[in-house]
Amino acid sequence: MADAVDPVNKRRQFLKFLAASPLMASAGLTGGLVDELIASGPGGAPDLELFMNEVGKQEIAIASEAEALNVFDFQVVAKQVLPPAHYGYMATSIDDDSMLRINREGFDRFGLRMRRLVDIRSIDSSIELFGKHWSTPITIQPTSSNAAFHPDAEIAVARAARNKNHIQMLSTVASSAIEDVTAARGEPIWYQLYADSYWNRTLAMVKRAEATGTPVLVWTIDLLGGRNTETATRLQRIDDRNCSVCHEPTATSRYSRSVKPMGQNLPDPIGESLSRGLTWDFIARLKDATPMKLILKGVVTREDALLAV
C-alpha cells in the first residue's frame, strides 16, 4: 500500500523548487523572503497563493521589446533608463496620482461578453469614423514631448501608426512639427489643441493644422485651470541635469511651449487674454473658424456630454 501523501510537505518542496529557479532569483524572491513565504500558511503550511502574489509584484525588466508581454513591461525599463524628470513627466498623474489608479480600476471593471462557436478565421475589427475607414478602433493619444523618450519623437509614432493604420493625434506640445509628422504618417493626422490665452494665437495653430489637411481638431478642455503633478515635480527636483537646451524655464511654468514646433512663430498677443475664462461659447468660435471636425477631449460627466452634442 502506497504511503499517504503529505500535501503540506509537497507544497513546501514545490515552493523551494520555484525559489531555486533563475527567474525567481532575478525577481528578488530569495533567501529569507522565500523561507518566510514557505512558513506563512496556517500551522506552518506554505501559502502558495501568497507566494504567487509576491511573484506577480516583482518588476522584472525585459531585455528587448520582443520579450514584452504587455505595455506595462516597458514601464519597468523606463524607470531604469530614463532621467528622473523624463520618467516623472510620462508617469505622473494629477495630485497624488489617484486619477491614474482610478482609471486603471475603472477599466478593470469592464469585461468582454465572449460569444462561442463563432468562425474566427476572418475577424474584422475595422470601423468607420468621420467618413474614413480604419483597421481598428485603436487611437494613439497625444502624448507630448516624445523626444524625451526617443530621438525620432513623434515621427517614430507616425511610422507605427502608418504600419497598423491607427488614428494618430498630435499634441500641441509635441517635439515634432505637424508637417513632418504628417509626411511620416503618409496622410493627415488629427491635431490636439491646447487653446492659447489669446485667440489670434490659437487661430494661428488651428490654421497651421488645417493647412496640412488635418480633418479633426481635438480640443483638450480638462486642463484649462492647470494641474498639480506631484510625481513629475518630485522627480524634477532630483534631476540635476542642465535642461535649458530643450526647455525654457518661465516664471509660472518650468517648460514653455515656445520651444515646441507648434509654439514657434506665433503672432504677438492681440486683444483680451482668455486664460481661464473659456466657456462653451468658445466651441462655436472654433467651429466657425475651421471646417475641421471638432472633438472635445476631457468630458467626464453626462451633463457635459449632453451639452457637447
Task: Write out the residue ranges for each language-model feature.
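Glycine- and other small-residue-rich loops at beta-strand/loop junctions that grip anionic moieties
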Residues: T92, N146, H150, L170-S171, ...
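Hydrophobic faces of well-ordered beta-strands that scaffold small-molecule active sites
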Residues: I138-Q141, Q168-L170, I189-Y191, L217, ...
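Conserved, mostly hydrophobic/aromatic
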Residues: P83, I140, A161, W219, ...
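Active-site-adjacent beta->alpha loops and helix N-cap segments on the catalytic face
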Residues: L170-R185, W199-A204, G226-T233, G277-I283
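Glycine-rich active-site/cofactor-binding loop and its immediate structural neighborhood
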Residues: S135-S171
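An N-cap/entry alpha-helix motif that binds or orients negatively charged groups
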Residues: G44-G131, I238-L278
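N-terminal secretory signal peptides and thylakoid transit peptides that target proteins
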Residues: A2-P22
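Alpha/beta enzyme core
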Residues: V206-V309
